Amino acid sequence: MAPLLQLLWLLTLLSTVALSPVPAKPWADDEQAWNLSSQELLAPARFALDMYNYGRAAGTRAVLGAVRGRVRRAGQGSLFSLEATLEEPPCNDPLVCPLPETKKTVLCSFEVLEELKEHLLLRRDCSPVNAKVTEFRNATFSSFLPLLDKDPLPQDFSVKMAPLFKDFMTTYNRTYESREEAQWRLTVFARNMIRAQKIQALDRGTAQYGITKFSDLTEEEFHTIYLNPLLQKESGRKMSPAKSINDLAPPEWDWRKKGAVTEVKNQGMCGSCWAFSVTGNVEGQWFLNRGTLLSLSEQELLDCDKVDKACLGGLPSNAYAAIKNLGGLETEDDYGYQGHVQTCNFSAQMAKVYINDSVELSRNENKIAAWLAQKGPISVAINAFGMQFYRHGIAHPFRPLCSPWFIDHAVLLVGYGNRSNIPYWAIKNSWGSDWGEEGYYYLYRGSGACGVNTMASSAVVN
């Protein structure tokens, strides 16, 4: 790329990107954010690696580990934002390293501009994993979780996992159609135990990861069945901002203790988290404004919300509009959950609740906490990284692994507080009470962990 063109690009990007505060969800409506394929990432990632290694002798160059990224249009080119792990080789050269160093993992953020197959590195921010993480947990970070981990299992590892797998099958009442499928699931289970260990090593909170009812599912199966990719791909209906309130929040709050939250539900093998998040919010709003707690129908939204995509995902903003346009929600007892799409059977005469509007909340977590304490449970969306293996405790995933750019699961904020001086959000999930802490997930509060503050919303009941 010519020097003049480089300068023009830099001036453009500095005026539009670098000098602007980075929002929690950075893409405008006409832009896209997604998990790019390895093929799309290959060229910009290799270029960033070459720039990182520039001037290094053979044998001292880092190698590329895991990569994830997003892209947006930039004039006639593309701007790639990459998050990558680099593996640094051991260093025994006293002229380079005063003390011998073992192999280490480095976390990097790059911005690469691509135009006419030419690349320009605009930003590089790298630091060793242990510099940021070992203060939270004593662990060996050579086992850092590759996001594209396809390494072969250690020899005989599946055999060693067989007793645990047998216990898993008994605990969760698993049966398989053939011996071959059982063997395959054992292999998946064994690989998942390695993944859970790596997630555990990099969690900065008190969360424990391990065997759950999802431990025999591949990562792809889990994402396809239980998560909601539309949350990161579509913008949905615009909502008005919530009216300002007193931003002073009490030290802790829990709507479960105040009767505003129904029992934990189970979405089953259906990506309908969006419906459960919204009905949970409406249940709380109706209770606070009418004094009655009713368990409301998610199935009505699967069947009758024609904008969202039922088990293939949906957006809370669209669901609120559907409830308002339909004329309300029936109860769970009257319109029971089936876990798949059926013909819409809604009857306005059977509706027990209605909403007047919906609002979008601030991305400031202190304001979210104040709104929750004063107004009720809140529909939010998060990046579900690690939740496949979450058992209990306060999750605080390493940010590059639980990026707010890749939210894929809608849930319900019901409270907040502190455990052992660690601030948390109490989150009602929709995977049944046999997951997590009796169906609940506890996530670190105060840093926008996993994008918890990026899509907070609520119905309005007058």
Swiss-Prot record:
Name listed for the protein in its UniProt record: Cathepsin F
InterPro entries linked to this entry: Papain-like_cys_pep_sf, Pept_cys_AS, Pept_his_AS, Peptidase_C1A, Peptidase_C1A_C, Peptidase_C1A_papain-like, Prot_inhib_I29
Enzyme class, first EC level, given as a word: hydrolase
Entry's localization field: Lysosome
Recorded catalytic activity of this chain's protein: The recombinant enzyme cleaves synthetic substrates with Phe and Leu (better than Val) in P2, with high specificity constant (kcat/Km) comparable to that of cathepsin L
Main localization category: other
Keyword Protease: yes
Coiled-coil regions, chain positions: none
Catalytic center residues: C273, H409, N429
